[in-house]
């Protein structure tokens, strides 16, 4: 089958998709990938055809404001700007690029990263089937849940349901604005009507969800076409970096992820918090070749850019993370308890899911104090319920194949 696959040019989106591409090629499918130009070599290493964004405005994920100057603000307004400028704003260009590629490569199906809204538009414009791969937690509205993005657990009882109704009412202006922005984007490529923005990236026919029910809130209205597949391991790029010494004491990994990698947000507070603790601390900066964290590294800590996770994770006792979805699934698949500092985008939702599942502690901020990090780490190391919570769904979060 000739497959056209569209993925947003973010490391956290590209990594799981590389595994999908490698598996599709192993099964003798003809795959063409469409993404930002900086990922050309990553996919070329898998032996697949690659086309960079052309009509869609390409960008550097580490300097988004250079292309989209309205982005980068904290809070709900910052999230709104990100959605409108990066994801909705590039969708018409994606649709034009992808529609041309459908003809050029003779694509029989378009597969889209859930945030690549041009993929669904392309399916409408060309008439070919559309499959979604959700590389972020499920964020579509549900009668059982509060609005997404607030990092709140499902409501309990009458007061909880009243809370959710009030929150949905308060969110209505933002929801309406996004719906109008997306409708304008659709009109740019000659489309009218369509689904609300909140579900526009999800194929009703086939949506592949990373994660599992073990870390996803129960929904009575989950569409039949949605399927959980656990985590999607990356392919095609080895994790470099060193190995930290092991002194027979607890080992704690600290990671800021691969997006918004300012070490002042989480790495430095954690190093300060654990400097006097009887633990070994492993730090990953998330930027290849970058080892500077802006402070002297304590004697019990080792800093590297990336780690070989399959080789390293089994030797760990806990992880302090900013809550990137791919990393969170990988840590939980290993049964590691987490301390999560989820500050923006989908990370507050991920942190909330971790605490709801019993697998860790939600610090409720992306800029925690050292004292808060220290208390949380000591707690997850001392209380076996967190490791048990992480372990309960570990098998379900592992890759399921298919």
Where are these regions (language model features)?
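Donor-nucleotide binding loops and adjacent catalytic segments primarily
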Residues: 211-318
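Conserved nucleotide-sugar donor-interacting segment of glycosyltransferase catalytic cores
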Residues: 88-161, 214-216
């Amino acid at each position: 089958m000739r497959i056209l696959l569209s993925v947003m040019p973010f490391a956290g989106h590209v990594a799981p998709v590389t595994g999908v591409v490698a598996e599709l090629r192993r099964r003798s499918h003809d795959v063409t990938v469409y993404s930002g130009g900086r990922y050309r070599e990553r996919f070329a290493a898998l032996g697949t055809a690659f086309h960079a964004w052309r009509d869609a405005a390409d960008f550097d994920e580490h300097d988004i404001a250079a292309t989209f100057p309205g982005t980068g603000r904290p809070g709900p307004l910052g999230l709104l700007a990100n959605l409108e400028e990066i994801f909705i704003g590039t969708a018409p260009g994606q649709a034009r690029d992808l529609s041309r590629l459908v003809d050029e490569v003779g694509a029989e199906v378009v597969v889209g990263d859930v945030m690549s809204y041009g993929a669904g538009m392309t399916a409408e414009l060309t008439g070919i089937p559309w499959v979604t791969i959700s590389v972020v937690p499920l964020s579509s509205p549900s009668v059982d849940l509060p609005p997404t993005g607030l990092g709140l657990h499902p409501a309990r009882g009458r007061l909880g349901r009243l809370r959710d109704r009030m929150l949905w009412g308060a969110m209505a202006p933002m929801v309406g604005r996004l719906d109008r922005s997306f409708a304008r984007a659709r009109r740019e490529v000659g489309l009218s009507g369509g689904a609300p923005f909140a579900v526009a990236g999800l194929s009703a026919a086939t949506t592949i969800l990373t994660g599992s029910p073990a870390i996803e809130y129960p929904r009575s209205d989950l569409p039949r076409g949605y399927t959980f597949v656990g985590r999607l391991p990356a392919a095609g790029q080895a994790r470099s970096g060193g190995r930290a010494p092991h002194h027979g004491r607890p080992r704690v990994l600290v990671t800021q992820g691969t997006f918004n990698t300012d070490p002042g947000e989480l790495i430095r507070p954690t190093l300060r918090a654990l400097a006097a603790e009887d633990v070994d601390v492993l730090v990953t900066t998330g930027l290849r070749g970058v080892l500077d964290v802006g402070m002297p590294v304590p004697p019990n800590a080792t800093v590297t850019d990336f780690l070989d996770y399959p080789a390293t994770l089994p030797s760990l006792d806990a992880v302090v993370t900013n809550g990137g979805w791919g990393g969170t699934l990988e840590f939980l698949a290993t049964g590691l308890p987490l301390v999560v500092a989820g500050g923006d985008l989908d990370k507050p939702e991920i942190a909330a899911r971790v605490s709801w599942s019993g697998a860790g502690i939600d610090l409720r901020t992306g800029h925690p104090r050292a004292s808060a990090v220290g208390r949380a780490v000591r707690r997850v190391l001392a209380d076996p319920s967190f490791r048990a919570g992480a372990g309960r769904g570990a098998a379900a979060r592992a890759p399921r194949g298919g």
